[in-house]
């Protein structure tokens, strides 16, 4: 599950299904992630192919958001709804609990992605708000972006 520089080229296989960046952008990103102590990244490989990615990082700017971990997760269609997403998120949440400064994990999810929303809710994430008509989908419809968060520690 741990990402390395060797995973960059296979990650291109996810591009047809996701909005991942170009190869050059991925190379810069992966190098930055590998060197950054406030990033947590997992790559899922199956039969020699990259089929999933979870990337998370602590917000550094503004400094008032330095307690927030934001993440992105992508799984190719054949491996969805098999527990892989749950495992990726569980590992990230476990890592986040060990990082004293992280108090909140946040994400944005399309309102049309009901399986992901259900998973996040099962893990304790709550809806914080919506950006109406944030995404224009290929079929011509629009989807909201739902902001969700998991609060790890509360100041008493």
What are these model-predicted stretches?
Residues 17-78, 89-90, 95, 151-154:
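Acetyl-CoA-dependent GNAT
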Residues 44, 88, 92, 105, ...:
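Hydrophobic packing within well-folded, soluble alpha/beta domains
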Residues 106-109, 121, 126-141:
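Conserved catalytic-core motifs of GNAT/GCN5-like acyltransferases
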Residues 141-156:
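Terminal substrate-recognition subdomain of acyl/acetyltransferases
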Residues 96-108:
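Conserved GNAT acetyl-CoA-binding A-motif
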Residues 82, 86-87, 98, 111-129:
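Conserved active-site alpha-helix within GNAT-family acetyltransferase domains
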Residues 1-17, 155-156:
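A short, well-structured alpha-helix characteristic of acyl/acetyltransferase catalytic modules
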């Amino acid at each position: 599950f741990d990402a390395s520089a060797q995973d960059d080229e296979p990650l291109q296989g996810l591009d047809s299904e996701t909005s991942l960046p170009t190869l050059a952008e991925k190379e810069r990103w992966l190098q930055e992630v590998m060197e950054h102590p406030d990033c947590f990244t997992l790559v899922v490989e199956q039969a020699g192919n990259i089929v999933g990615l979870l990337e998370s990082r602590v917000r550094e700017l503004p400094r008032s958001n330095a307690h927030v971990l934001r993440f992105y997760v992508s799984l190719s269609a054949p491996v969805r709804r098999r527990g892989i997403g749950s495992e990726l998120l569980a590992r990230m949440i476990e890592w986040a609990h060990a990082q004293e400064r992280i108090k909140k994990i946040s994400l944005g999810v399309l309102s049309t992605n009901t399986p992901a929303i259900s998973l996040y809710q099962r893990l304790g994430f709550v809806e914080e708000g919506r950006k109406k008509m944030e995404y224009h989908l290929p079929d011509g419809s629009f989807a909201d972006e739902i902001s969700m968060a998991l609060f790890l520690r509360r100041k008493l």
